[in-house]
């Protein structure tokens, strides 16, 4: 065909010069050529015009236009004779070496025979011709491709446009190890590692594993006659595998000539190690609760277990079931699983068992060795023994925080070092630490390889133990009689008080730099999962300072007291309370929940100080106190999720919380036990619940059984009480009585006294209306002249409880609460036990009572000293309707509804008007508390009467001042009405007049126009 007839559509067709790079098209553009440009024949020599090897890409400007291409047409023209050209087909495409995969996109292979390697002229060290490349470049070695060996750049690096580097080293190549020899050595090395890392107890369990038997060679098999340098599996492992498979699973101890009684005893002990296996939960629950234990309980306050070894043994099933069940029971309280658990601890038994095991001594050998055999204790074993003993020590200190609870463990009996840092314990790194008194028992030598500074080796656990030990010494001094035996005064330089104060301050100052409180150290402890322990330690340190400084207020009324001494004590008290709130706020922001119950005790102690800061006249103290009190209330509210049962206790001291289960059983298990066949209790019978005995809780809540011989006396006394009540009802009110001295005298307001004589064995001879608080106290003249918060003079005149009596029964006052020589409970936790101090009407906070001890709010709000220490109100200021009151009453079984008169005095569901009411088995917030916290702490409806059984109540009422204007706390004012606050005097008067419209007090308020006086600004001068 003549191409001259198709000039308009003539074009040059180009084949693919490099089919391995289809995605990288070259600048072979289409050009319009004359037909004469196409030769009829194309020889092989036509491939050499480009000057590049076959398969490589020609260089040039890749952005060149199609019209500017100058590619030779004789290579790709379809007009060439393809039948005479063996390298092209009828379409002009290259067809050489199609079997090498280039037609499918593969890279063409280079002609090995046509090219001589650059290293072919080199000689080996032996003088022979080199057949292999001596050294490949770094790039080819990384990509694991064959290197051409050219220098300065090989073909691969030149083609890839990367630097070509040959790494020359003088190190001789190691001789190649026989493959079978290498396989033979690897299991032995791994076995040696496992044996070194596995404890002895785990090795004994591993010996019971069934071992497989190696199958023998197949009979009749002809061995390979081909010689080889590698050994066969039978030759390499035959002897070892045969000896290992034939070894007994449990080696028999030869020469065991122990007596049969000892063998039987060991058999019983081994049986006890597996007792309780059937009660274990699933493995998933065990592992989950173990993680919960180490996240929420470990280190707050007890450092008992070694987490890596515990989790390893838990997975292997080598832990005693009793230990697994104990960890699960303790951790169940903090799990998100709704099925909670119960746990209790017999502290006395734990302490005796610890001493029996000689845990209080730092021994190098196991003291329980049989037949005098001494087993060396490893560092982990010794550290676990120490931590168990320190846990018993802390438990004894917490359990002995009450007023009449002596401590059993003396500090000088513990001869073991304090725990090491947690990372040393986790990674099995021995390190010396100090004793409790600061001495180093075994100082290491420089060649031991241990850290010489013993103080730097101690972490949070060690200083937490020192803080709790100091707290125990402070309690012993303040609460258990040591303060009364101290002949020196508190402000002198020699008394024990100054020593305890210096110890509390110096303990915080002695912390290493890594344990000082800072944002950096907190982040470091976060990474170690010990931030909660770190914050808890600092809370305990500040609580010691708060406790000692607050106790100094009780000596204010004594002669010769320096004002500077009490000014410094007040500043330290408020500073420590603020620091505790800061730590709680930081824990909330860092999401590090401090779950120890003792932290809640510290938060409550701090909150009592913040309340005084809120009602202070010093304007600089109020904002800080309000913010800190909000933080403490939030934290205590969160603690209710885990320690909810603690709110139902009759005694509010921290140490008395352990009286919750005096039998070791909860109420649900004791009152409604499961029916089962009674078994012989054996030696544990002393710990059983005795049905004929009564617990402390039953004694406080259930009526006291009356003796038969006293029935006639009780029946005869009932009409006398009724006649006395009628006489009191008929007494007219005094006409000139002022508003703040108005008082209702309804006979129905006086309830029956609780009779403690049957249970306490007390002799009561006084009349029913006798008030023992009005009698003089010859032994304590100062106490008799002070205004007690339980006296009628301090009772609220507008008593909104019809059942509130005007006196304490003499039986209750006769109970010994461990009072000091001044007639009051010692300064330990006075805000937790009502009536714990005397209150001088002429002095306030700085006048001898504690931060919350018997103070009315308007008592401390009348003035403030420059240092922030609150003053009391002047002697001419009357008490008014404010302060604290308490009552102990008896309520008979009644089913009458509310109504007028004596027939309807059931007093059903209601709320209280004031700020806070603490009653037996109830913590009832008042209406003011609900308004201040925006219903976070609601005013709980509760019943006084309308019960089918007789009940006894001991109630404590904390009332705001009559002049107080209550406002919501910061952060709780969203949507609160009224926004301007509530005047408590008007609120209380409205409630009184609505509930008692027929009383003479209500009539006088209306007739004499006294109700309008509540609008005067002089009666709205206080803002709590």
Swiss-Prot record:
DNA-binding region located at which positions?
Answer: 137-164
Superkingdom to which the source organism belongs:
Eukaryota
Q: Which Pfam families match?
A: Fungal_trans (PF04082), Zn_clus (PF00172)
What's in the GO CC field? Answer: nucleus
Answer whether the UniProt record assigns the keyword Nucleus to this protein: yes
Q: Where in the cell is it found?
A: Nucleus
What Gene3D superfamilies does the record tag this protein with? B-lactam Antibiotic, Isopenicillin N Synthase, Chain, Zn(2)-C6 fungal-type DNA-binding domain
Could you list this entry's UniProt keywords, alphabetically sorted.
Answer: Metal-binding, Nucleus, Transcription, Transcription regulation, Virulence
> Which factors induce or repress this protein, as stated in its UniProt record?
Exclusively expressed during infection of common bean.
The terms under GO molecular function for this entry are:
DNA binding; DNA-binding transcription factor activity, RNA polymerase II-specific; zinc ion binding
Could you state one GO biological process linked to this protein? DNA-templated transcription
Transmembrane residue ranges: none
Q: What else is known?
A: Multiple copies of the gene are present in highly virulent fusarium oxysporum strains.
According to its UniProt entry, the function of this protein is described as:
Zn(2)-C6 fungal-type transcription factor that has a role in the establishment of the fungus within the plant and/or the progress of the disease. Regulates the expression of virulence factors such as SIX1 and SIX6.
What is this protein called in UniProt? Zn(2)-C6 fungal-type transcription factor FTF1a
Organism source for this protein? Answer: Fusarium oxysporum f. sp. lycopersici (strain 4287 / CBS 123668 / FGSC 9935 / NRRL 34936) (Fusarium vascular wilt of tomato)
Which lineage ranks, top first, belong to the organism behind this chain?
Answer: Eukaryota, Fungi, Dikarya, Ascomycota, Pezizomycotina
